[in-house]
Amino acid sequence: MENIIVIKLGGTASDNLTENFFQKITEWQGAEKKIVLVHGGGHYITKMMEALQIPVETKNGLRITNQQALEVTKMVLIGQVQPTITSAFQKRGISVIGLNAGDTGLLEAERLNDRDLGLVGKITKVKTNLIEQLLAGNIITVIAPLGIDNTYNWLNVNADTAACEVASALKAEALYLLTDVPGVKNESEIISEINTTEINKLQTSGVIKGGMIPKLESAAFAAKHGVGQVIITDSLENAGTKIRSKVAIG
């Protein structure tokens, strides 16, 4: 399927969807673009865990997830964040549906090799049939970043990773990773473009750290696996940082 745009909503973006955002979505739909959203919810998961007095721990930008933390993650993503997003679309008369790994095993996953992270997984397969059927009906799909393994256990998946896997599986023409910052910064300057070969150097030099590490690694994967363009930004209007997979010639 052509003309697919995947958008990852992260940080507190689900509570700050602007009229400009919805206007852009409407413009894209008018141009026969098909829209898929993958949402995070880390901020709200942390707030809920703190309220329940569950320790919050991370490693290399990923949340360490035991069974208790996983249950909170599922509750917040499927029961709080996703309905907030879908309701905002419905309020504006835009057809939308929320999906998660429980829907026809949408996102198959396996645990990461780093067992210190607990019940954290990586996507091994995106079952695109359901998504494509909905997109053919001009219905926006909103996907929670949770996976199910081959023994039907749920796994927490980094939302950037999930978005990049979905975009790659759909061969999207564009992937927007929306976050709380306007792009990748080197001190106070936004880096306009990053080659995938530069990411390790930027990490070693401390330019990128924390949650930006898995974000850039995921973006690099998407850029190398069939996604037309990958952009890290804080809004659909801003240029942000483009991730490219080949060295420019000339």
UniProtKB/Swiss-Prot annotation:
Keywords: Amino-acid biosynthesis, Arginine biosynthesis, ATP-binding, Cytoplasm, Kinase, Nucleotide-binding, Transferase. It is an enzyme of class 2 (transferase). GO terms for cellular component: cytoplasm. Catalyzes the ATP-dependent phosphorylation of N-acetyl-L-glutamate. Its EC number is 2.7.2.8. The record marks 8, 215 as: Transition state stabilizer. It comes from Listeria welshimeri serovar 6b (strain ATCC 35897 / DSM 20650 / CCUG 15529 / CIP 8149 / NCTC 11857 / SLCC 5334 / V8). Coiled coil: none annotated. The keyword ATP-binding applies. Belongs to the acetylglutamate kinase family. ArgB subfamily. The lineage of its organism: Bacteria, Bacillati, Bacillota, Bacilli, Bacillales. One of its GO terms (biological process) is L-arginine biosynthetic process. Substrate binds at residues 41-42, 63, 156. Pathway: Amino-acid biosynthesis; L-arginine biosynthesis; N(2)-acetyl-L-ornithine from L-glutamate: step 2/4. Its main location: cytoplasm. The gene is argB. This is Acetylglutamate kinase. One of its GO terms (molecular function) is acetylglutamate kinase activity. It catalyses: N-acetyl-L-glutamate + ATP = N-acetyl-L-glutamyl 5-phosphate + ADP. CDD domains: AAK_NAGK-like. It comes from the Bacteria. It is found in: Cytoplasm.
